[in-house]
Every structure is written in structure tokens, then in C-alpha cells.
Amino acid sequence: MARGVNKVILIGNLGQDPEVRYTPNGNAVANVTLATSTTWRDKQTGELQERTEWHRIAFFNRLAEIVGEYLRKGSKIYIEGSLRTRKWQDKNGVDRYTTEIIANEMHMLDNRGGGNSGNYGNHSEGGASNKQSAPTSSQTPTAGDDSSVADFDDDIPF
């Protein structure tokens, strides 16, 4: 029996260009913020309401390099990963926490800048084994193939 499930699936737009850095042993790390939006109609006023959530996403190794090369602010992506909370101390010695998503799979859902949509997976943070699956016509959504994805682009500010 499973001890628990820690899985996150998100579709959203990047809020900024990816920031790619390298660890001392040469592993790539990319950090992005991803906006996801929910819309609903207010029962009392009938007005359409929207709430945008911002998520911190971390990519590692080859997946981080792909993110740095192909994604830009506003890029629409699908990610799968797991939640992780980190703890550190600030300058005053106060404990601080942040929760982020460690991505192990990413699909580009648009082809801004002339690039191809693609599916990429990274199932290792330590660099021991990376998995990258090249896009195929049966796996890759096209720019006009958003029929299964709700259209949240209308009110996102980028």
C-alpha cells in the first residue's frame, strides 16, 4: 500500500523569463513562477470573478536547460511534479519557509517565437539519469489544439 501521494499537475503561463543557474558540480537549475487562474460567476452580482494563483516551479538538469532555452514570460506550459517545502534562516536568524513544485515533466503548449511544442521529462534531481522524450506528432499538441484546455489567456496580464 502506498504511504502517500505527492503529485502536482498545473497548466499556466510563466510570469517571468526563466532564471537558469548551475550548481558547483555543474547541474542546471531553473526557477520560474507560473500563473494559474480560476474564474467563476458571483452568485449575488452575476459578475465574472477571477483569482490568479502564483506557483514557484523548480526544474533540474536537462529539463532546466530546455526551460531556459525555449520558455519565456507568457509561455503556456503543462507541468507535473511534487510539492516540496524548504526551510532557511534569514539575515536576522528567523526561520523562513517556501513551498515550491519540483517539476519532473513539462509540456510546452504553445509555440511562441517559432519553436515547436514539445514534451520533456526529467525524473532525476541528482543527474544520475535524465529522460527526455522528443516530441512526436501523436504526443505534441499543436498551437491550435487547445480544445481540451480551458482558455484562461483572456485575463492574464502578459
Curated annotation (Swiss-Prot):
Originating species: Coxiella burnetii (strain RSA 493 / Nine Mile phase I)
Composition skew (Polar residues), residue ranges: 129-142
Residue ranges occupied by any SSB domain in the UniProt entry: 5-110
Region ranges (Disordered): 109-158
Gene Ontology biological-process entries: DNA recombination; DNA repair; DNA replication
GO molecular function: enzyme activator activity; single-stranded DNA binding
Assigned keywords, A-Z: DNA damage, DNA recombination, DNA repair, DNA replication, DNA-binding
GO cellular component: nucleoid
Function text: Plays an important role in DNA replication, recombination and repair. Binds to ssDNA and to an array of partner proteins to recruit them to their sites of action during DNA metabolism.
Key word Transport present: no
InterPro entries (alphabetical): NA-bd_OB-fold, Primosome_PriB/ssb, ssDNA-bd
Subunit relationships: Homotetramer.
Protein name: Single-stranded DNA-binding protein
Gene3D superfamilies: Nucleic acid-binding proteins (2.40.50.140)
Motif residue range(s): Important for interaction with partner proteins: 153-158
